[in-house]
Curated annotation (Swiss-Prot):
It holds the Pfam family 7tm_1. Changing residue 173 to F: Decreased proton-induced G-protein coupled receptor activity. Changing residue 137 to A: Induces a shift of the optimal pH for activation. Residues 165-180 are annotated as: Extracellular loop 2 (ECL2). This is G-protein coupled receptor 4. CDD domains: 7tmA_GPR4. A multitude of proton-sensing residues, which include extracellular histidine residues or triad of buried acidic residues, contribute to activation of the G-protein coupled receptor activity and pH sensitivity. Activated by a network of residues that connects an extracellular-facing cavity to Glu-153, a conserved charged residue buried in the transmembrane core of the receptor. Protonation likely drives conformational changes in extracellular loop 2 (ECL2), which stabilizes movement of transmembrane 3 (TM3) and a series of rearrangements that connect the extracellular-facing cavity to Glu-153, a residue only conserved in proton-sensing G-protein coupled receptors. GO terms for biological process: adenylate cyclase-activating G protein-coupled receptor signaling pathway; cellular response to acidic pH; G protein-coupled receptor signaling pathway; response to acidic pH. Glycans are attached at residues 12, 172. The record marks 153 as: Required for activation. Belongs to the G-protein coupled receptor 1 family.
Length: 373
């Protein structure tokens, strides 16, 4: 431990890795602008669609709302990061703003992953165990789980708020939320982020969708076309999480391991700098993929959003009250907004028959947002 602290002091005093910040001037700003242009309006519409589901007492809407909120918070940080990269990785907005926007930026990566995991588990319970876990899949439970997710990720990622996050390099650039070589506490935090923030939720998602596919294959009442759609959607979710987040966490883990082996070695940092920044930028594509995957590929939700936009345009043209929007554009039986049946009231009359019918309804109507209206 003493030698590690000595290495940290030596690195702080004598070592500043010669990373090429010029490579960030075009790719990251361009990508972030695209994410803002596409991600902000689509997440706003996804947030509205999720709110409509919550009004229908659908617990899935809670997770989707939180996912959209996390994406929108992430997007609000991008303008300052665009400015940062345009100025060759030079933060000009002070220590407080660096801490705040860096904290929001990185925390919401893991909040998004966590809520994608919650959605996966919720869909697994809806498809594979619609009766057994009916009481668990409620709005109150979803609210409690959401609060736990936010609290856990905020606490787990709060360490940078208590450290200086502005660092000068040898070219007088002011780095924000990055130091080359990294600090020991950052390496430890990166290990937590990689294994518990990314790999653990992704493993749960893989297990959940494996269970979904197994349940779908064993359900004779689901049409062949619907089964294929469910499988495509499940695979799309896994691939999006893999493509958006896995490259970044591979390099994050690589950098951290290299540092722990040789704390003051700049060779690895300099070689990985460009690729690391590219993979970090690619995580932003999740903000575009989330609303597309969970809302706009779905016929019912897409129809709702189209009706809402048409109604909104009509209100502006005719000058009517905006309140008419709330009652004029809800497709109650979209795959996202189907109300769960009251299992226990109907079972009183004919338990066996109604259990079978409810099971069929759940499997047909609640299979990963993909049942046709």
């Amino acid at each position: 431990m003493a030698s590690l602290r000595g290495s940290e002091t030596m690195c702080n005093i004598t070592t500043s890795c010669n990373v090429d910040s010029n490579i960030d001037q075009f790719f990251q700003p361009t990508l972030y602008i695209i994410v803002i242009v596409l991600g902000f309006p689509t997440n706003c519409m996804a947030l509205w669609a999720a709110y409509m589901q919550v009004k229908q007492k659908n617990e899935l809407g809670i997770y989707l709302m939180n996912l959209s909120i996390a994406d929108l918070l992430y997007i609000t940080t991008l303008p300052l990061w665009i400015d940062y990269f345009v100025h060759h990785d030079n933060w000009i907005h002070g220590q407080v703003s660096c801490k705040l926007f860096g904290f929001i930026f990185y925390t919401n990566i893991y909040v998004s992953i966590a809520f994608l995991c919650c959605i996966s588990v919720d869909r697994y319970l809806a498809v594979a165990h619609p009766l057994k876990f009916a009481k668990v899949r409620r709005v109150k439970t979803a609210l409690l789980v959401s609060a736990i997710v936010w609290l856990t990720e905020i606490v787990a990622n709060s360490a940078p708020l208590f450290h200086d996050e502005l660092f000068q390099d040898r070219f007088n650039h002011t780095f924000c939320f990055e130091k080359y070589p990294m600090e020991p506490w950052v390496a430890g935090m990166n290990l937590y982020r990689t294994f518990l923030g990314f790999l653990a939720p992704w493993g749960i998602m893989l297990a959940a969708y494996r269970g979904i596919l197994r349940a779908v294959r064993g359900n004779v009442s689901t049409e062949r076309q619907e089964k294929a759609k469910i499988k495509r959607l499940a695979l799309s979710l896994i691939l999006i999480v893999l493509l958006c987040f896995a490259p970044y966490h591979v390099l994050l883990l690589w950098r951290s391991v290299l540092f722990l082996i040789n704390p003051c070695d700049c060779g690895g940092e300099e070689n990985l700098f460009g690729a690391y920044h590219v993979t970090l930028a690619l995580t932003s594509l999740n903000c575009v993929a989330d609303p597309i995957l969970y809302c706009f590929v779905n016929e019912g939700a897409r129809h709702d959003v189209g009706r809402a936009l048409a109604t909104l345009l009509g209100l502006f043209q005719r000058g009517k009250s905006p309140e008419t929007l709330m009652g004029a554009s809800i497709t109650v039986e979209t795959p996202l907004a189907v109300k769960k049946p009251d299992f226990y009231s109907e079972v009183k009359t004919n338990a066996y028959k109604n259990d079978i019918e409810v099971l069929k309804d759940e499997c047909l109507q609640m299979t990963i947002l993909s049942v046709k209206k």
